[in-house]
Design a protein with these regions (language model features):
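Regulatory, non-catalytic segments
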Residues: 1-114
Length: 114
């Protein structure tokens, strides 16, 4: 498993926004995102990240405690040790107090000529 140094998430909110801080779960620890900009109201784009500097066993974007949050587009940029930075995109989803979106993706495999 690679050591994740930091990540940044960009979310375009669909038709259901939320008022709460955006949180994520990292290895079963619930944390707020840092270095945030934008918003989570309908049509707004939110950006935030976190410098974790740890091996990622699990990582998920967590739904709000009350109501629903519709995510139209989700992009996560990863910076892991000993690998070039990479990004992953996720399909639209709706989160609530019982749902999470798994946003961890292993780094792409190295390619080489044969």
């Amino acid at each position: 498993m690679p050591r994740l140094n930091k990540f940044k998430v960009r979310v375009k909110t669909g038709n259901k926004g939320m008022q709460e801080p955006v949180r994520f779960s990292f290895n079963s620890h619930l944390l707020p995102l840092e270095d945030i900009s934008g918003g989570t109201q309908p049509g707004e784009v939110f950006e935030g990240g976190y410098e974790v500097r740890s091996v990622a066993h699990s990582m998920a974007l967590v739904g709000p405690d009350k109501g629903e949050w519709s995510l139209k587009k989700i992009t996560v940029d990863f910076e892991c040790e000993n690998t070039p930075p990479y990004s992953a995109e996720f399909p639209a989803v709706e989160l609530n107090d019982t749902t999470e979106l798994d946003i961890w993706k292993d780094p792409p495999l190295s390619t080489f000529d044969v």
